């Protein structure tokens, strides 16, 4: 899908408007056969200085592993961005249009102590109430090896656990993940 396919969809997504402050994310990785291999949650802290968006992403995986990724994203023009991160190879490039972002980059993944280079084609879609959905297709040498599905949330007013929303009182949200079934 081309970014222009979402040009009239609202709410409008601009990374520098969405990511400053605290964001929560929950996601999973499915292999090319549709098997869920990992689940995770992330705490994301973002700052925007008028030119660069800095994101610190702290991941907690269902196996207890923790990981940190630090992004520096520059706005190139009205709708285009370039970014780098500690495990991204070269420069990530993206374009916002309407409520969506098309984002592509190469990354070094640590798989059981072995690093492999893969390509991400990521599509993000801003929804109402601070929710953003993301689907990233991961490929190696042009062959899809899996998909990461993510949900981002801003302005949380509910406690979230592995089984879902439990109450509607404002509270701090903590990651809790159970084993993959």
Predicted features along the sequence, with ranges:
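Generic alpha-helix detector with strongest preference for long hydrophobic helices that associate
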Residues: 4, 10, 14, 21, ...
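Central antiparallel beta-sheet cores of small beta-barrel/beta-sandwich binding domains
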Residues: 26, 30-111
């Amino acid at each position: 899908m081309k970014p222009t396919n979402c040009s009239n969809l609202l709410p409008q997504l601009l990374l520098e408007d969405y990511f400053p402050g605290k964001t929560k994310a929950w996601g999973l990785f499915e292999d090319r056969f549709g098997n869920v291999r990992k689940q995770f949650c992330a705490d994301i802290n973002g700052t925007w200085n008028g030119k660069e968006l800095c994101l610190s992403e702290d991941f907690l995986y269902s196996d207890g592993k923790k990981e940190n990724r630090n992004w520096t994203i520059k706005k190139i023009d009205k709708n285009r961005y370039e970014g780098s991160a500690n495990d991204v190879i070269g420069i990530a490039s993206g374009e916002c249009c309407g409520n969506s972002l098309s984002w592509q980059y190469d990354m070094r993944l640590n798989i059981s102590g072995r690093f492999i280079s893969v390509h991400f084609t990521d599509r993000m879609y801003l929804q109402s109430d601070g929710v953003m959905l993301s689907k990233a297709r991961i490929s190696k040498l042009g062959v899809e090896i899996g998909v990461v599905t993510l949900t981002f949330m801003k302005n949380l007013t509910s406690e979230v656990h592995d089984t879902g929303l439990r109450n509607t009182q404002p509270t701090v949200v903590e990651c809790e993940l159970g084993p993959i079934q």
